Design a protein with these regions (language model features):
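Hydrophobic alpha-helical transmembrane segments
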Residues: 11-15, 50-55, 88-89, 121-126, ...
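N-terminal, membrane-interfacial amphipathic/helix-forming hydrophobic leader that caps
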Residues: 1-35, 181-244
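Membrane-helix interface segments
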Residues: 45-47, 84-85, 117-122, 142, ...
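Functionally important transmembrane alpha-helices
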Residues: 145-208
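Juxtamembrane helix-loop-helix connectors linking adjacent transmembrane helices
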Residues: 1-13, 35-104, 111-116
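Membrane-interface helix/loop boundary segments of multi-pass membrane proteins
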Residues: 101-126, 158-165
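Small-polar-interrupted transmembrane alpha-helices in polytopic inner-membrane proteins
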Residues: 95, 119-136, 149-153
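Membrane-interface helix caps and helix-loop-helix hairpins in membrane proteins
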Residues: 73-81, 134-143
């Protein structure tokens, strides 16, 4: 079955991101002489931050889904017949690794490193562009999709700085991806999976809103939730700084 083979490859790819975490942490420790805490692995309230991040990640993506449904850009057709709890759990664990890996690389390493030498705003923009560039070879990438990926990078950076740890933003990123592909059955940055809780259909002619072949990350619904989310974060009190 081609779809099963595709899911197997996707799951293996997700777990392979553990290598990014390991290499990044080793580079920070051995080359930059940084403590692990400077990457954002702070102990205080670790589980609370992680669970909060999971909830926010699911919530903001669901907000984008609702925008698409309200505007007639997405139809949720009900429970997906191909759902498998075993495959779903593997995707969940895989995305927990993948989401954290991208956050460790882009926020924990790159943002902190750049911000030590330049203003924080420079670090935020630079790592957001790097994050978006990592997805340039994905299927269905468009100019709006790239802009949204930059916006996600900015949103994640502000969340990281405001919360002062990597746990929350890593969880947020992971569940954002899981919600797309394996809850709502929508392409994750152009990647399609066969195992999802719900079956959804992109409405033709509404690609500007729903993102078309790239998934919701390529449409204006995600643009709106990320801009609003970032503005809300900027208005909140900063919890603590990541340790220098």
């Amino acid at each position: 079955n081609a779809l099963v083979q595709t899911d197997t490859m996707t799951i293996l790819m997700l777990f392979s991101n553990a290598g990014i975490i390991l290499v990044t942490l080793l580079f920070c420790k051995l080359i930059q002489k940084r403590k692990v805490t400077t990457v954002g692995f702070q102990k205080p309230d670790m589980w609370k931050e992680y669970l909060t991040g999971m909830g926010i990640g699911f919530g903001i993506f669901t907000a984008a889904v609702l925008l698409c449904v309200i505007t007639g850009s997405l139809k949720i057709q009900g429970m997906a017949p191909s759902f498998s709890i075993g495959i779903f759990v593997l995707f969940l664990l895989g995305y927990l690794v993948q989401g954290m890996a991208e956050e460790v690389l882009c926020r924990g390493y790159f943002l902190v490193s750049v911000s030590r030498r330049y203003p924080l705003a420079v670090g935020i923009i630079a790592n957001a562009v790097l994050f978006a560039a990592l997805h340039l070879l994905n299927n269905g990438i468009t100019v709006l999709a790239f802009i949204n990926l930059v916006l996600f990078g900015v949103f994640a950076s502000v969340y990281f700085v405001k919360r002062g740890n990597i746990w929350g933003v890593g969880a947020l990123h992971s569940i954002w991806n899981l919600a797309q592909g394996n809850v709502y059955g929508i392409r994750v940055s152009g990647i399609q999976t066969s195992c999802s809780v719900l079956s959804s259909e992109m409405v033709a002619g509404r690609e500007l809103i729903n993102g078309g072949d790239f998934g919701l990350e390529g449409g204006l619904a995600v643009t709106i939730v990320l801009v609003v989310g970032t503005l809300v974060l900027l208005a909140t009190r900063q919890r603590r700084y990541v340790e220098d």
